[in-house]
């Protein structure tokens, strides 16, 4: 399998900055994902995949989790999802509000995605 091209320093820097300013929903989900808590799977937070920075990514499982707030949606998210899927990733999306109010269901969906 060909290796993914190295991230540019600008993307890496931006990903590092985003890790410092997590939303409440990102922080809550990260607490559930970190240290391989779900099915023993390792996730990375604010991980760059080519030209995009993903909210959460398991490179080994090729699974990306995106959290959406009011600033997301539309053609740009569709293009981003298409781009990532073309590179073999499965992308699942949740609304920030769902993570805050119904984390158990969010975790169930993630577990199901990992089992497929």
Question: Locations of the language-model features?
Answer:
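Solvent-exposed, charged helical/coil patches
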Residues: 1-41, 115-116
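Basic, amphipathic alpha-helical patches used to engage nucleic acids or provide basic targeting signals
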Residues: 18, 22, 47-113
